[in-house]
């Protein structure tokens, strides 16, 4: 009986810690997420740059001008949003993000903890296989449950309204999706999210390995008390940042495909069709649009989420 009660308390602890970590991370990094989503969109206004081409051997020696489309950078998109829409637009989609991020992170970490417990009884305890399967299972459940909220968030972030014009709130956006596309509209981009499970698996496999290395490190083992707690906290932040950075670079293209699938009135219909269309029309570099914004958003965000999660579990777990 006591064991069942203890397991229930542990699950609630992981739910609470995961929810707190996700909420803190979402608030701090919202502007970067809006910029990243705009960069990923097919509706991004590309700048036309004219490069002179000199043709040698011509009688006049005159050059020709070749127009080339150039993707605007992070700072240019930021400047455009501030000038045309105002600073408030940098927090577009924060409402559904806050509504979804706490339960999303809570469900994820609870599923991860429970799956890890189950897989430890099947495979070598705390092995990479256990971490990979646990992370993949938790991501699959979370993506399936939370996709409608993330769909609404993306639509709100892609909405462009000039300064002074009224923007849709969360409920209005959800109503519009339902009226124009039905229930299926809320699940657009879900296949891309499933493809993105690879990022989660890579991230947590690296994170757990780094965490184990930090735990076994002689410097950490030799410290005591407050020094150990402080060094451990910053060590976890560094481990989270490195793991997310590596995972993001490897699996980033699915993010661009997911954003395209969630665009309103989109020509994109399925994961494979979208990948082919983007490659044919824009080239392979289009799959990495917004990667820099993603890295400078996700690395600190993941560091905040994971370290807050571990810190709360440590604090409340000790008092329990």
Curated annotation (Swiss-Prot):
Keyword Ligase belongs to the record: no
Establish whether keyword Phosphoprotein is in the entry. Answer: no
Q: Where is the chain membrane-spanning?
A: 12-32, 49-65, 121-141, 190-210, 233-253, 298-318
**Gene Ontology CC, one term:** mitochondrion
Q: Which GO terms describe its biological process?
A: cellular response to insulin stimulus; cellular response to insulin-like growth factor stimulus; mitochondria-nucleus signaling pathway; mitochondrial genome maintenance; mitochondrial respiratory chain complex III assembly; mitochondrial transcription; mitochondrion organization; positive regulation of cell growth
Catalysed transformations (reactions): UTP(in) + UDP(out) = UTP(out) + UDP(in); dUTP(out) + UTP(in) = dUTP(in) + UTP(out); 5-methyl-UTP(out) + UTP(in) = 5-methyl-UTP(in) + UTP(out); 5-methyl-UDP(out) + UTP(in) = 5-methyl-UDP(in) + UTP(out)
Give the membrane topology, semicolon-separated if more than one: Multi-pass membrane protein
Q: What is its main location?
A: mitochondrion
Name the keywords, alphabetized.
Answer: Membrane, Mitochondrion, Mitochondrion inner membrane, Repeat, Transmembrane, Transmembrane helix, Transport
Alphabetically, the GO molecular function entries are: pyrimidine nucleotide transmembrane transporter activity
Under PROSITE patterns, the record lists: SOLCAR
InterPro entries on file = Mitochondrial_sb/sol_carrier (IPR018108), Mt_carrier_dom_sf (IPR023395), SLC25A33/36-like (IPR049562)
Where found? Mitochondrion inner membrane
Intervals holding Solcar repeats: 9-118, 126-213, 231-315
**Function in brief:** Mitochondrial transporter that imports/exports pyrimidine nucleotides into and from mitochondria. Selectively transports uridine, thymidine, guanosine, cytosine and inosine (deoxy)nucleoside di- and triphosphates by an antiport mechanism. May import (deoxy)nucleoside triphosphates in exchange for intramitochondrial (deoxy)nucleoside diphosphates, thus providing precursors necessary for de novo synthesis of mitochondrial DNA and RNA while exporting products of their catabolism.
Q: What does the sequence similarity comment in the record state about its family?
A: Belongs to the mitochondrial carrier (TC 2.A.29) family.
Could you tell me what this protein is called? Solute carrier family 25 member 33
Which gene name does the record give?
A: Slc25a33
């Amino acid at each position: 009986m006591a064991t069942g009660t203890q397991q229930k308390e542990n699950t609630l602890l992981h739910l609470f810690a995961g929810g707190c970590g996700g909420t803190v991370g979402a608030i701090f990094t919202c502007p970067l997420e809006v910029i990243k989503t705009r960069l990923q969109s097919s509706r991004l206004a590309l700048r036309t740059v004219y490069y002179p081409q000199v043709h040698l051997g011509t009688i006049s020696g005159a050059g020709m001008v070749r127009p080339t489309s150039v993707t605007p950078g992070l700072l240019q998109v930021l400047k455009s949003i501030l000038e045309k829409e105002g600073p408030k637009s940098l927090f577009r989609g924060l409402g559904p993000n806050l509504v979804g991020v706490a339960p999303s992170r809570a469900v994820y970490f609870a599923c991860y903890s429970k799956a890890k417990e189950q897989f430890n009884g099947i495979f070598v305890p705390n092995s990479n296989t256990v971490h990979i399967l646990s992370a993949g299972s938790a991501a699959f459940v979370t993506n399936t449950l939370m996709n409608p909220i993330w769909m609404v968030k993306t639509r709100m972030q892609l909405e462009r309204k000039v300064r002074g014009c009224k923007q849709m709130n969360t409920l209005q956006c959800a109503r519009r999706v339902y009226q124009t596309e039905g229930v299926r509209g809320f699940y657009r981009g879900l296949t891309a999210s499933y493809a993105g499970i690879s990022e989660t698996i890579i991230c947590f496999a690296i994170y757990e390995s780094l965490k184990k290395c930090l735990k076994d490190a002689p410097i950490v083992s030799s410290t005591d008390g407050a020094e150990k707690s402080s060094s451990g906290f910053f060590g976890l932040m560094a481990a989270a940042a490195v793991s997310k950075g590596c995972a993001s670079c490897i699996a980033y293209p699915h993010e661009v495909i997911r954003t395209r699938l969630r665009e309103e009135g989109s020509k994109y219909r399925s994961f494979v069709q979208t990948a082919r269309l983007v490659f044919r029309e824009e080239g392979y570099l289009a799959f990495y649009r917004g990667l820099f914004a993603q890295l400078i958003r996700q690395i600190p965000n993941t560091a905040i989420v994971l370290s807050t999660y571990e810190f709360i579990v440590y604090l409340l777990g000790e008092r329990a």
